[in-house]
Amino acid sequence: MRHGKVHRKLNRTAEHRKAMFANMCASLIKHEQIVTTLPKAKELRPIVEKLVTLGKKGGLALRRQAIAEMRDVDQVKKLFDVLAPRYKDRNGGYTRIIKAGFRYGDNAAMAVIEFVDRDVDAKGQDSGPVQETSEAA
């Protein structure tokens, strides 16, 4: 019986879920807006809210705790140095979920999860590996 179980399994093992949400947290902090399925967005929201609260409290131990959760030192730095000061006067509710229709292939409910008062210039920046091109040609 699954009485009292709060979180969704999302048809993944525990390790897969933990890794997936770590990657999604890093992507959300990096781009400040991501598109995913609605159940994943609903599961991601409390994780990100707790990370922002850690960032607001500050301190080395909490920074290490955030690194252990997210596994991306650069995004933890952004979390503590950029996002935490931005939300210092807000008590929770740092993210919003906007329903975004249904995916074409499998009709899965899609959603946009984004930070409230987000930086619109952060979306899509550095979204993949950069290939160096020589301009000397």
UniProtKB/Swiss-Prot annotation:
Pfam families: Ribosomal_L17
GO cellular component: cytosolic large ribosomal subunit
TM ranges: none
Keywords, comma-separated and alphabetical: Ribonucleoprotein, Ribosomal protein
Listed PROSITE patterns: RIBOSOMAL_L17 (PS01167)
SUPFAM superfamilies attached to this UniProt entry: Prokaryotic ribosomal protein L17 (SSF64263)
A biological-process GO annotation: translation
GO function term, MF aspect, one: structural constituent of ribosome
PANTHER family assigned to the protein according to its UniProt record, in alphabetical order: LARGE RIBOSOMAL SUBUNIT PROTEIN BL17M, RIBOSOMAL PROTEIN L17
Subunit structure: Part of the 50S ribosomal subunit. Contacts protein L32.
NCBIfam families named among the record's database cross-references: L17 (TIGR00059)
Family: Belongs to the bacterial ribosomal protein bL17 family.
Name under which the protein is recorded: Large ribosomal subunit protein bL17
Lineage of producing organism: Bacteria, Pseudomonadati, Pseudomonadota, Alphaproteobacteria, Hyphomicrobiales
Gene: rplQ
